[in-house]
Amino acid sequence: MVRKTTEVKKVLTQSEVDTVNHFFKKAFNFGKEKKYAEAVACYDKVIKLTPNHYIAWYNKATDLARLNKYEEAIACYNVAIKLHPTDSSYWTNKGLVLLLQREYAEAVACFDVSLRLDPLNKTAKKYRTSAKEKQGEIFCLT
């Protein structure tokens, strides 16, 4: 017997929607005030109720990077990218964090994807060049 499976999506109540909106706005404002740890805590509440909220994942990643929590930031960027792979800024920011970690080849790969999605992305172009130069320095030293 073959069963047909369907994905069950949680339907939020109006109260939960209000809670998500409240914590998202609160997180965004904390970020503007440079209270990144508080922002991350609020994004966690948003994500708990709406795990596919790719903007919350992206913003959380950005605030984690600002706290120098690079591994956690990359993990969050990966989720955001999985949920919304066509946003060039997601790839660019992940590349920037990888660049900070001296993961030059991985950074270049992210910038390449970003530039395929948005060939005019000046930030991706600039930092791709920087990552390639740093990558070249490593090869010259060995």
Question: How should these model regions be labeled?
Answer:
Residues 4-22:
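TPR-adjacent "capping" and linker segments in tetratricopeptide-repeat scaffold/adaptor proteins
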Residues 20, 54-55, 88-89, 122-123:
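Helix-start (N-cap) detector for alpha-helical repeat units in TPR-like alpha-solenoids
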Residues 47-48, 79-82, 115-116:
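Conserved structural position within tetratricopeptide repeats
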